[in-house]
């Protein structure tokens, strides 16, 4: 019974090397002209056939064991910026495997190389920069201690440039003096009630409120567009004989009348989500036409108006 089954490592159960595994999307010579076998057996036959011209350097090489991982960088195994060493396998090593989706510092500066070379050069550059920053920090710390007299000076340190002032400098006052602007901000009111020649008659970029007639103007910046829209809106209201209250200039409400929602001369703006008497029974006209003088006309009068 034991002689019926082949051994575990045999050409019957395992495809002999060299061969390509299924899913390999690279080029294999004469593969498109061969058929009748599995992908592994067919590529193994093509790669070992002496009659087929192919490159002497194989793309895939057999390597039963992964290469030893080297966790050392140029300049020794110093920690980055004084970071505490932690147990376990570090993520950033000198032999990075392609397909790693984590962040590699300085990798954007290197190109035209393989992933492993780019990762190695980027991490070496990053370590060198951090070591330089650590050296500068130690130098500043040493100079601070020397200026404060906490360390005895050597002959070389006595030749360093010395400051005339001791650090930290003493404070002249406990609290800073209050700052008062010479020309404080003065609110100028709503742009709707400004004169047409006023340069502030516009809305700044980023304003998300509704500006009448602005959707029909294109090709200019937002302040210029809103200025032209409000001027055009004012001219349209003048032709209709609608005048807005000037009480807002004196600190009053910006509306025509406080608490008034349904106007007699104008309809409501589109997308108004409030209640309009009799609107649900009307059709055949725009929202503004149907909501004009909502409290004065009956449903039959609104359907026959205009």
Curated annotation (Swiss-Prot):
Localisation: Cytoplasm, Cytoskeleton, Cilium axoneme
Region listing for Disordered, in residue ranges: 61-92
Matches recorded under Pfam families: CMI2B-like
Primary localisation category: cytoplasm
Tissue: Expressed in airway epithelial cells.
Keywords for the protein's UniProt record, in alphabetical order: Cell projection, Cytoplasm, Cytoskeleton
Its biological purpose: Microtubule inner protein (MIP) part of the dynein-decorated doublet microtubules (DMTs) in cilia axoneme, which is required for motile cilia beating.
UniProt protein name: Ciliary microtubule inner protein 2B
Organism: Xenopus tropicalis
């Amino acid at each position: 019974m034991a002689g019926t089954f082949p051994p575990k490592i045999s050409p019957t159960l395992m495809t002999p090397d060299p061969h390509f595994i299924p899913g390999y999307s690279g080029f294999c010579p004469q593969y498109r002209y061969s058929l009748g076998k599995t992908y592994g057996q067919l590529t193994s036959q093509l790669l070992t056939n002496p009659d087929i011209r192919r490159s002497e350097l194989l793309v895939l090489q057999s390597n039963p064991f992964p290469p030893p991982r080297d966790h050392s960088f140029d300049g020794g195994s110093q920690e980055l910026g004084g970071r505490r060493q932690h147990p376990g396998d570090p993520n950033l090593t000198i032999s990075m495997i392609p397909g790693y989706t984590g962040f590699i510092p300085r990798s954007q500066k290197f190109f035209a190389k393989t992933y492993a070379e780019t990762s190695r050069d980027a991490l070496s550059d990053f370590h060198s920069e951090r070591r330089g920053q650590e050296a500068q920090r130690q130098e500043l710390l040493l100079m601070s201690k020397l200026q404060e007299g906490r360390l005895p000076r050597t002959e070389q340190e006595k030749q360093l440039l010395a400051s005339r002032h001791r650090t930290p400098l003493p404070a002249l006052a406990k609290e800073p003096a209050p700052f008062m602007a010479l020309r404080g901000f003065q609110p100028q009111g709503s742009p709707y009630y400004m004169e047409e020649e006023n340069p502030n008659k516009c809305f700044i970029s980023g304003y998300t409120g509704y500006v009448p007639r602005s959707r029909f103007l294109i090709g200019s910046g937002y302040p210029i567009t809103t200025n032209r829209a409000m001027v055009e809106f004012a001219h349209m209201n003048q032709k209709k004989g609608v005048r807005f209250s000037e009480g807002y200039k004196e600190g009053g409400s910006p509306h025509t009348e406080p608490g008034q929602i349904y106007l007699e001369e104008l309809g409501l703006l589109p997308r108004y989500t409030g209640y309009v008497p009799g609107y649900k029974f009307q059709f055949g006209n725009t929202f503004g036409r149907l909501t004009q003088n909502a409290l004065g006309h009956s449903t039959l009068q609104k359907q026959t108006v205009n």
